[in-house]
């Protein structure tokens, strides 16, 4: 699925990626649905989101009226579940950012190679800063649900670390694939890392669903790194571009792009304004492994900046107080002298008298 990538350990930590704004066009001209323009590949919004069924306990036979009421309650609940699944349209996702420069540089070479063969595909390319793996998609409808999602992400952290057993999870990327010729992606190579990532994805889905969040897809989770999708450029359909031709990327079929180490998972918005570097808006992030024991550089810079500002403010306040005191002191001296003058004047008058 497509993505946005890593977020802030507060909201600004996702700045390590850049991406251009995805254009929105007349989606009726595209073979892919409107959801295809979001950072995941053709999500099936009719999936089973894991909503619990109403218990089907035995109803006492001696109370047919109550039995009828129970059946009515169950029917209402089923209708609500069906409506919830029908209205399910993910707008947030968990992202694993791709920050290895070897991987991102290799993807740029791939994209440029494709564009040299067909420059009509320019707008179908994913921006430099948006390369990622989408771990989970979800629907968060308001600020309260976003806060619940943030809590769920924090709860996910120890589960992920337990799955990894203190080891790094290395994700090697090798070769090219497509989803029905509409979405082009770099493949995640086979290996034990795949089962670990699948377990993390399933754990994330369960963690968010247990908090009442609509999350996940009906299709099997297939981790991938999207580099282009035709739905980003609906006009291509009118120009006769129906699919991504294999010949465009054939020389990269067996290319090894590099390895990414999982160190961060971000909760990102698909719809909020992207960051200045092109990366998706991040609500929160968790860091995994050694980098969690060492404070991130960005966070350290923020901390240092705050200290510098606090010191500057404190110094300014102290300077102001000193200047204020200095201004008062001459005035106080003049008052004393004036009082002494008054007393002396009174004495002179008395002498005259």
UniProtKB/Swiss-Prot annotation:
**Tissue-specific expression:** Expressed highly in the heart, and moderately in brain, lung, liver, kidney and testis. Hardly detectable in spleen and skeletal muscle. In kidney, isoform Delta is expressed in the principal cells of the IMCD.
Q: Which Gene3D superfamilies match?
A: Cyclic phosphodiesterase
- List residues binding AMP: 134, 224-226
Span list, region Disordered: 1-33, 47-85, 321-353
Q: Where is the composition biased (Basic and acidic residues)?
A: 1-22, 66-76, 337-353
Superkingdom per UniProt: Eukaryota
Alphabetic keyword roster: Cell membrane, Cytoplasm, Membrane, Nucleus
Q: Where is this region: PKA-RII-alpha subunit binding domain?
A: 299-353
Give an example GO cellular component term for this record: protein-containing complex
From the UniProt record, which GO molecular function terms apply?
A: AMP binding; protein domain specific binding; protein kinase A binding; protein kinase A regulatory subunit binding; protein kinase binding
Annotated region (RII-binding), positions in chain:
301-314
Q: Which SUPFAM superfamilies match?
A: LigT-like
GO BP annotation list: action potential; cAMP/PKA signal transduction; cellular response to cAMP; modulation of chemical synaptic transmission; positive regulation of potassium ion transmembrane transport; regulation of membrane repolarization
Residues reported to bind CMP: 134, 224-226
Annotated region (RI-alpha-binding), positions in chain: 300-324
User: What is its quaternary makeup?
Assistant: Binds cAMP-dependent protein kinase (PKA). Interacts with PRKCA; only the cytoplasmic form is capable of interacting with PRKCA.
- Functional description taken from the UniProt entry: Probably targets cAMP-dependent protein kinase (PKA) to the cellular membrane or cytoskeletal structures. The membrane-associated form reduces epithelial sodium channel (ENaC) activity, whereas the free cytoplasmic form may negatively regulate ENaC channel feedback inhibition by intracellular sodium. Isoform Delta may be involved in shuttling aquaporin-2 (AQP2) to the plasma membrane.
Task: Give the matching PANTHER family.
Answer: A-KINASE ANCHOR PROTEIN 7 ISOFORM GAMMA (PTHR15934:SF6), RNA 2',3'-CYCLIC PHOSPHODIESTERASE (PTHR15934)
| Protein name as annotated | A-kinase anchor protein 7 isoforms delta and gamma
In its UniProt entry, the species of origin is given as Rattus norvegicus
The gene name reads Akap7
């Amino acid at each position: 699925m497509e993505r946005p990538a890593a977020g802030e350990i507060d909201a600004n930590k996702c700045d390590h990626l850049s991406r251009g704004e995805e254009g929105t066009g007349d989606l009726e001209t595209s073979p892919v649905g409107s959801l295809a323009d979001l950072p995941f590949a053709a999500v099936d919004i009719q999936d089973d989101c894991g909503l619990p069924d109403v218990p089907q306990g035995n109803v006492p036979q001696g109370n047919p009226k109550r039995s009828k009421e129970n059946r009515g309650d169950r029917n209402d609940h089923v209708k609500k579940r069906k409506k919830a699944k029908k209205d399910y349209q993910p707008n947030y996702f968990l992202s694993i950012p791709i920050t290895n420069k070897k991987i991102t540089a290799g993807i740029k070479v791939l994209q440029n190679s494709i564009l040299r063969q067909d420059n009509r595909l320019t707008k179908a390319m994913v921006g430099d800063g948006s390369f990622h793996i989408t771990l989970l998609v979800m629907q968060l409808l308001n600020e309260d649900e976003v806060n619940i999602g943030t809590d769920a992400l924090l709860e996910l952290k120890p589960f992920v670390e337990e799955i990894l057993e203190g080891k790094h999870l290395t994700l090697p990327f090798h070769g090219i694939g497509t989803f029905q010729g509409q979405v082009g992606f770099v493949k995640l190579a086979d290996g034990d890392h795949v089962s670990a990532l699948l377990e993390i994805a399933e754990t994330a889905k369960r963690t968010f669903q247990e908090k009442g969040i609509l999350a996940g897809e009906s299709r099997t989770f297939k981790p991938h790194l999207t580099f282009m999708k035709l739905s980003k450029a609906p006009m291509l359909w009118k120009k006769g571009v129906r699919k991504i031709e294999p010949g465009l990327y054939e020389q990269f079929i067996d290319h090894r792009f590099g390895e990414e180490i999982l160190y961060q998972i971000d909760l990102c918005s698909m719809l909020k304004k992207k960051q200045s570097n092109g990366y998706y808006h991040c609500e929160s992030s968790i860091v995994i492994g050694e980098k969690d024991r060492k404070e991130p550089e960005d966070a350290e810079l923020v901390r240092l900046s705050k200290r510098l500002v606090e010191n500057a403010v404190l110094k300014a306040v102290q300077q102001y107080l000193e200047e204020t005191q200095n201004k008062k002191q001459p005035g106080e001296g003049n008052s004393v002298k004036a009082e002494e003058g008054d007393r002396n004047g009174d004495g002179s008058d008395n002498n005259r008298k």
